[in-house]
């Protein structure tokens, strides 16, 4: 069984919004691109979200989504609430 990993690009407007929110909150983000993992000769695939590391906290984001997941996919907030969250940590 062979797993194929393809890196996906950040949606430019999403990255700009995240950079703006982080700049306004006076924090420095580290961006790590997500990927698509496909199992060869099947129709199975997994989309690994982009990671944004801020103050030792990993935020997960998907292209074309307004949700931000904190540490894992169980806890999410809206992108509009991110500034408030960053100021609270």
Label the model's feature ranges.
Residues 27-77:
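Acidic, low-complexity, intrinsically disordered interaction modules
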Residues 1-24, 28, 75-89:
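Mixed-charge, Lys/Arg-enriched low-complexity segments
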